[in-house]
Regions:
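Short N-terminal leader segment in a subset of presequences, especially plant chloroplast
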Residues: 10-11, 30
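Short N-terminal segments immediately surrounding and downstream of signal-peptide cleavage
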Residues: 22-37
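Absolute protein N-terminus
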Residues: 1, 20-22
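Surface-exposed, polar/charged faces of alpha-helical domains
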Residues: 33-113
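Alpha-helix initiation/capping motif
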Residues: 13-14, 79
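Bacterial N-terminal signal peptides that target proteins for export
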Residues: 1-8
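N-terminal signal peptide c-region/cleavage motif recognized by signal peptidases
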Residues: 14-20
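Short, linear, compositionally biased motifs with a strong N-terminal bias
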Residues: 12-13, 64
Length: 113
């Protein structure tokens, strides 16, 4: 009986720890300006924000890795937790790639004027 309860409680604890982990997805608090219209000062300011956002995303991904490392692979629900973790990780990479493409377009447009 105790073993059965333990098997029910452990996954709940694991999911709960993932749900309440301190891995907060960083918010992108800026818009990439139009390179054709932006001033040099605006572009330099945005470059700093882009770099900070990339650094924040790297911290987020490290946090996800650290949280997953705390969970035993022996846990019955480990594969599902690992899958959710990978989805969050990959989504942050895709967001960073989209932002980098947008920034690259703005820089090329700025340099072409």
């Amino acid at each position: 009986m105790f073993k059965k309860k333990l098997l029910i409680i452990l996954p709940l604890i694991a999911f709960g720890s993932m749900a309440f982990a301190e891995c907060n997805y960083p918010k992108k608090k800026f818009d990439v300006p139009s390179g054709k219209k932006a001033s040099e000062a605006e572009m330099v300011e945005t470059m700093g924000k882009v770099k900070q956002f990339q650094a924040d995303l790297a911290v987020y991904r490290t946090c996800l890795d650290d949280e997953l490392a705390k969970i035993s692979p022996e846990l019955e629900s480990f594969e599902e937790i690992e899958k959710m973790n990978a989805q969050k990780y990959n989504a942050s990479v895709e967001d960073e790639q989209r932002m980098a493409e947008e920034w690259g377009e703005a820089v090329r447009a700025f340099k072409s004027k």
